Amino acid sequence: MCLSEMIPGQSGVVTIISPHSKIRRRLQDLGIVPGTHVVCVNNSPLGDPKAYAVRRTVIALRKEDAAEIIVRETGNA
């Protein structure tokens, strides 16, 4: 599933970041690499961006950027 499809409280592990992503390097700098555990924390009022907990910090990603990240669902946080 894409990271953008996660709902608040759902968790997963990053498996793939699209090699065509415009922000691939920025995601890596933020610690989002294959094997990273992520939790969808919250939706903004209009649903975009969403907040994700990654490596003891919370980051916001736009839907179009989160769609470039494939995760394996691990359940609820």
Tell me the role of every PLM-derived stretch.
Residues 16-19:
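A structural micro-motif recognizing beta-strand termini
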